[in-house]
Design a protein with these regions (language model features):
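Exposed, low-structure sequence patches enriched in small/polar residues
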Residues: 511-517, 522-818, 823, 827-839
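Post-signal-peptide, soluble extracytosolic/periplasmic N-terminal scaffold domains
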Residues: 2-11, 18-19, 27-297, 626-702
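Extracellular beta-sheet/turn segments enriched in Thr/Pro/Gly and aliphatic residues
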Residues: 155-159, 366-369, 774-795, 859-878
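Structural motif
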Residues: 67-70, 83-84, 173-177, 300-308, ...
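Transmembrane beta-strand segments that form the barrel wall of outer-membrane beta-barrel proteins
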Residues: 162, 181-199, 220-232, 261-265, ...
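Feature captures outer-membrane beta-barrel proteins of Gram-negative bacteria and organelles
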Residues: 178-180, 205-218, 242-255, 392-406, ...
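A short, solvent-exposed loop/turn motif at the edges and junctions
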Residues: 118-120, 164, 761-775, 847-860
Length: 878
């Protein structure tokens, strides 16, 4: 085998192909370029490849004129990833035509296609005069624009100066590229069970099944959630079976409004009013449709540049924005929200080297909106609760938040029902160095189940501040104060009281009860304080504190919650010390817990280049103490096994004792497996009195036009990987996800309205499989089942030596298989590499435009060729 053909074979086994033409042209061009380098210098405008450098006989070399102008490929249609200014735009079939002597082949892109990628067509002279289906001469019509096809990456790189681009936020993906997905049905199942042997209380068995089903048709998504439970115990006669329907809803996105429509069962957002479940209809903003640079709160930067200048913005010492602006006033409104605070340092660097530096204070609370951004929700329906004592009154709710200049936000909302009316209004402010604050008040008129009417107000404060110098982040301080007459909507939904009869010494009389007789609504909420603080200690330690304190009207009882913890690391050894306290207003005493956890990876004692399986394992120790004398100590190991690390295990053993409970040994062991067809787990735990076996299986089923595909549990948005004929191919960066026997797999999650990269590990392909493309990009809408399709060539890998009139075929001739879509370029000695070939067929060869510059070769291979890594064959082309 010649060196050139060996390189061709190695290149192809790495699956670096394009759809219609092989990348062998790259090596032809490289070889010819090396030969050309030995010649005397020629004018770059008139490159000429002397075929005598390839063969003494000029007839032994095909027409290589296309390489003289830099063409790596002949004109044709190729599937490519389109990148504009280094940002991904789309993956589509693009037709490439012959350009001038300097351009080689050029892409044919229409005005509408360029406009969808952000080109401001009105800013380019003469572009709007072109026909809708005309190919835009991009590099000649747009000054300094470039178009380059990277054959090896199957990528079309476009660059267009910012002056000709529409003003779009960073990370913007045109809605035209959002993929609503395919029509398909889905089912998620999650089954778990346990068997308990209790030496004192007897044996018990429990099982639970959660079924989440759905149907996607176009942009509509239908979802349903149903559960089943089973319980049997020695303490009770018989067993209990229970099916329960949780919810059903239909939803879709409303792209022009950047909103989402929900019909059926849903829930309201809890940003202004308390979140509630409903059955009805809701139209609400979906900020996921916005680019990352437009989500969350960030200040709008205004400045003035003397000339064309570079603007750099830093936050907490990190560059978060960099752009070039024209002379004059400028506005930057697409800064990515980075945390909740941290002042922004803006630097304007002029072309002459002079700089302007100023600081824009920045803090945020959850309700703050960017300047000019509006978020809303409108809900109408009936109240929905799993509490049988609550009714289903109809209600209407609306909320609105709007960002104003100078860091201000106004917001408000209404809740209206027959027995309840509430109105909210609030303001928020980014106060810069002083933090961020929002204040709102809700006025409510309530009619309770005893028909008593109440008016009240509730005032809420939210505050956020970071002290960057000390590493302190006051993530949230919240306080809500409610008057004695304030009730929320849920309080008014309990079944009404019509009175009851009581016996007295004067006989039976009818009495109208007070609401305190049946429902515990007398102790309505009064004040609530919330606090969350994190403190950075050095580079590897973090201290956190969080807590809440709730008081009630009519009682001195309070709810209290408090958590504190210290996370630290020394080299690769991690340990955590934590404390928690919980007190319920209606229960005596309080629950406290102190815990210590230490984890040491075994790689701490292994060489960095060790191949031992123990490099994926860690030793652990944990201690917990309830501060009432009860303590548990556990030590053990945990880690992962198998090539894909999709089998995880944990074994712990120790001692529990003290307090009022029994003392003795305790421990547990668990195994969890994540596979291409689903997940499974099993575990066992024991103490002196109790032994427990628990187990579970979960997964997803996807029914689509190409059949049924099993996978791991499906999230809201998923990707169907389609590689027909390529079984057991691994999806990169996904534990346990591989194609099934037909070449299909389910990527169980994807990020909606964002570019998702789906790649196959070509090292896991069978020897008889080649891929045209190993990477696909998808941009799914919310709830979509999008298809990432890969074209696999399944068949024999063939190295053919072709002759014509007893001579090797000309160097550079194009070879195409009639029975498959495989093609290649003839190297020296008439050799060509083809993949995905059947046992018998014919190939067509072309090396020029003349009548006698093409031929056809028939071939027949023995059956054992299907088991060979590479088959060599000689054939006569006629």
């Amino acid at each position: 085998m010649s060196y050139l053909n060996l390189r061709l074979y190695q290149r192809n086994t790495q699956c670096l192909h394009i759809r219609k033409h092989r990348l062998a042209g790259f090596f032809v061009r490289l070889f010819v370029a090396c030969a050309f380098a030995a010649q005397a210098p020629l004018s770059s405008a008139e490159l000429y490849f002397n075929p005598r450098f390839l063969a003494d006989d000029p007839q032994a070399v095909a027409d290589l004129s296309r390489f003289e102008n830099g063409q790596e490929l002949p004109p044709g249609t190729y599937r490519v990833d389109i990148y504009l200014n280094n940002g991904y735009m789309a993956t589509r079939d693009v037709t490439f035509n012959t350009g001038d002597s300097e351009q080689g082949i050029v892409p044919c892109l229409t005005r509408a296609q360029l406009a969808s990628m952000g080109l401001n067509t009105a800013s380019v002279a003469g572009m709007n005069l072109l026909a809708d289906d005309a190919c835009v001469p991009l590099t000649t019509m747009v000054q300094d624009a470039t178009a380059h096809l990277d054959v090896g990456q199957q990528r079309l790189n476009l660059t267009i100066p910012q002056a000709f681009m529409s003003n779009r936020a960073r990370g913007y993906i045109p809605p035209e590229l959002w993929d609503p997905g395919i029509n398909a049905g889905l089912l998620n199942y999650n089954f778990s069970g346990n068997s308990v042997q209790n030496r004192i209380g007897g044996n018990s068995h429990y099982a639970y099944l959660n079924l989440q089903s759905g149907l996607n048709i176009g942009a509509w998504r239908l979802r349903d959630n149903t559960t089943w439970s089973y319980n049997r115990s020695d303490r009770s006669s018989g067993s209990k079976n229970k099916w329960q329907h949780i919810n059903t809803w239909l939803e879709r996105d409303i792209i022009p409004l950047r909103s989402r429509l929900t019909l059926g069962d849903g829930y309201t957002q809890g940003d202004i009013f308390d979140g509630i479940n409903f059955r009805g209809a809701q139209l609400a903003s979906d900020d996921n449709m916005l680019p990352d640079s437009q989500r969350g709160f960030a200040p709008v930067i205004h400045g003035i540049a003397r000339g064309t200048a570079q603007v750099t913005i830093k936050q907490n010492g990190y560059d978060i924005y960099n752009s070039t602006v024209p002379p004059g006033p400028f506005t930057i409104n697409d800064i990515y929200a980075a945390g909740n605070s941290g002042d922004l340092q803006v630097t304007i660097k002029e072309a002459d080297g002079s700089t302007q530096i100023f600081t824009v204070p920045y803090s945020s609370v959850p309700l703050l909106q960017r300047e000019g951004h509006t978020r809303y929700s409108i809900t109408a329906g009936e109240y929905r609760s799993g509490n049988a004592q609550q009714e289903k009154p109809r209600f209407f709710q609306s909320t609105l938040l709007h960002g104003l200049p100078a860091g201000w936000t106004i917001y408000g909302g209404t809740q209206l029902a027959d027995r309840y009316r509430a109105f909210n209004f609030g303001i928020g402010k980014n106060m810069g160095a002083l933090g961020a604050l929002s204040v709102d008040m809700t006025q409510a008129n309530s009619t309770l189940p005893d028909d008593s009417q109440h008016d009240g107000q509730s005032v809420r404060f939210l505050y956020n501040k970071s002290l960057n110098e000390s590493g302190t982040n006051i993530q949230l301080v919240g306080y809500r104060y409610s008057t004695s007459g304030y009730f929320n909507f849920a309080d008014t939904t309990y079944s009404r009281m019509n009175g009851y009869n009581i016996e007295t010494q004067d006989g039976v009389i009818q009495v109208k009860p007070k609401f305190t007789d049946y429902y515990n609504l007398a102790y309505n909420k009064r004040g609530k304080l919330q606090l969350t603080v994190t403190q950075q200690l050095g580079r590897t330690s973090t201290l956190y504190l969080s807590g809440s304190h709730q008081t009630y009207w009519g009682t001195s009882n309070v709810d209290e919650q408090f958590q504190a913890g210290l996370n630290t690391a020394f080299e690769d050894i991690n340990w955590t010390l934590s404390y928690s306290l919980t007190k319920n207003a209606w229960q005596k005493g309080r629950d406290q817990m102190l815990a210590l956890n230490v984890n040491i990876p075994f790689s701490h004692w292994l060489r960095s280049d060790s191949k031992s399986q123990w490099r994926h394992a860690s030793a652990s120790y944990s201690m917990s103490h309830d501060l009432n004398g009860r303590m548990t100590n556990l030590a053990g190991v945990y880690g992962t096994l198998l090539e894909d690390n999709n089998l995880s295990y944990s074994v712990q053993t120790g001692y529990a004792g003290g307090g009022d409970g029994n003392s003795g040994s305790t421990g547990y062991a668990t195994l969890n497996y994540r596979g291409g067809y689903g997940n499974a787990n099993i575990g066992y735990s024991h103490s002196d009195d109790i032994k427990q076996l628990y187990y579970g299986v979960s997964g997803g089923v996807l029914a689509h036009a190409n059949g049924v595909t099993l996978g791991q549990p499906l999230n809201d948005t998923v990707v169907l990987v389609k590689v027909p004929g390529a079984k057991d191919a691994k999806v990169e960066n996904q534990t346990g996800v591989r194609t099934d026997w037909r070449g299909y797999a389910v990527l169980p999650y994807a990020t909606e309205y964002r570019e998702n990269r789906v790649a196959l590990d070509t090292n896991t392909l069978a020897d008889n499989v080649d891929l045209d493309n190993a990477v696909a990009n998808v941009v799914p809408t919310r709830g979509a089942i999008v298809r990432a399709e890969f074209k696999a060539r399944v068949g024999i890998k063939l190295l053919m030596t072709l002759t014509h009139n007893n001579k090797p075929l000309p160097f550079g001739a194009m070879v195409t298989s009639e029975s498959s879509q495989s093609s290649g370029i003839v190297a020296d000695n008439g050799q060509v590499y083809l993949s995905g070939m059947p046992l018998a067929g014919k190939v067509q060869v072309k090396w020029g435009e003349e009548e006698n510059a093409h031929c056809v070769a028939n071939y027949q291979l023995p059956p054992e060729s299907q088991q060979q890594l590479l088959t060599q064959l000689s054939a006569e082309c006629r």
